[in-house]
Structures are given as C-alpha cells and as structure tokens.
Curated annotation (Swiss-Prot):
Residues annotated as signal peptide: none
Protein name: Small ribosomal subunit protein uS4
Keyword Ribonucleoprotein assigned: yes
Keywords: Ribonucleoprotein, Ribosomal protein, RNA-binding, rRNA-binding
InterPro entries in UniProt: Ribosomal_uS4, Ribosomal_uS4_bac-type, Ribosomal_uS4_CS, Ribosomal_uS4_N, S4_RNA-bd, S4_RNA-bd_sf
GO terms for MF: rRNA binding; structural constituent of ribosome
Lineage, highest ranks first: Bacteria, Pseudomonadati, Pseudomonadota, Alphaproteobacteria, Rickettsiales
Role noted for this protein: One of the primary rRNA binding proteins, it binds directly to 16S rRNA where it nucleates assembly of the body of the 30S subunit. With S5 and S12 plays an important role in translational accuracy.
Biological source species: Anaplasma marginale (strain St. Maries)
Length: 204
C-alpha cells in the first residue's frame, strides 16, 4: 500500500497538480517535475499534450487503468446526453469512488482495498468489486468490523475534503446514500480536471 501511495504522489508531481487536494502532497511545496532537470519547470504542452495530460489526471484520480477508462468512455459516448457528464457520472458511480467521496477513507486507493477485502455493503449485501456501479437510492455502508480501522477513523476525523451534494452521508452509521448521478460541474474536484479535453483525447 505504501508503494501505491508513493506512486500516487509521483503522478501528482509529474502532472503538476495536487490531484486529491491533500496537504501532504509534495506538489504543494515542490511544484516542478521530479528528476535531474525537474527544477527547470514544466514544458508548455501542445494541444494533444494537454488532452493526454487531462486523460492522465482522470486515470490517476480514479485509480484506473487506461483500458478501464477507455471502456468507461465508450459506454458514456454511446449514451444519450453530454459525453463529459456521462463519463463523470459513470466514474462517480463506481463503488470505490463512492466510499472515497463519502469521506470514509483517505484515498481512492484505500477505498479499493476496503471494497476488495469485503468491508463494504450495498443495500445490506457485501460487494467486493471496486468498479461496481452504484445506482441512485442505493445505500453504501462500511461493515461494523471495519468501522474501527485506523484509516477509516482518520478519514472521518479529517476535514480535507468536502462531501459532494449527490451523497447523503450518515457518519455515525458509516453509511452513504447515493442520491443521484452527478454532472461534471457538481463534482468538487480539488484540481482542474478538464473533462472536455478527455473527450477530445478519445474522440481524436
């Protein structure tokens, strides 16, 4: 898990943004790329470079592989409505993301771990698939045996993140009701995520 967190911070540094809005992210104090020539700063990106960087930000923020993000985009593209909103709605509906957004864990990586270890239920039933799609009205809850885990307690006590409006969180019960599928403009991203550039990247 430590290795995953270190890779996460390297991603923030490489992209030049504090992706998760955490105070301990090194990009907050060293806003330049890592490596021998990192202090020279970030290069000006081409149009494609900006699209690729936006794609990388989404992939890192949601802890997904390129294949997973591509497949999610294709489903969003084939649905009616705005493709960017469809994409963000699908990403925010992932079970691990709901657990993270509700503030029950400090990172989306630990949310994936919590789900995989069968510590999370949806409507009272254990679900151990991080990519499981939560539907409006579903109740996601941390199982009692996991409510005292240090990472859960630390995340709940932290004030670093704001719970989005599409979730109704009961901190005492360690539960969150998924009220609706959010649009891009409704998600309180700590960084500028530029979903329009992601759509352009996949559409090019």
């Amino acid at each position: 898990m430590v290795a995953v967190v270190e890779r996460k911070y390297r991603a923030s540094r490489r992209l030049g943004v504090n992706l998760w809005g955490r105070s301990k992210d090194p990009v907050a104090t060293r806003n330049y790329p890592s490596g021998q020539h990192g202090s020279m700063g970030y290069k000006k990106l081409s149009s494609f470079g900006r699209q690729f960087a936006a794609h990388q930000k989404f992939k890192c923020y949601y802890a997904m592989s390129s294949k997973q993000l591509t497949n999610t985009f294709l489903r969003a593209y084939n649905r009616k409505g705005d493709t960017g909103d469809n994409l963000v709605g699908a990403l925010e509906s992932r079970l691990a993301v709901v657990v993270y957004s509700a503030g029950f864990v400090p990172t989306v990586f630990s949310a994936r771990q919590l789900v995989s270890h069968k510590h999370v239920t949806v409507n009272g039933k254990v679900v151990n698939i991080p990519s499981f799609s939560v539907k409006p009205g579903d109740v996601v809850q941390i199982r009692e045996r996991a409510t005292e885990l240090p990472m859960v307690l630390a995340a709940i006590q932290s004030q670093e993140r704001r719970v989005p409006d599409h979730l109704e969180v009961d901190t005492a019960q360690r539960s969150a009701r998924y009220l609706r599928v959010p649009k891009y403009c409704e998600v309180p991203y700590p960084a500028n995520m530029e979903v329009n550039l992601v759509v352009e990247f996949f559409s090019g």
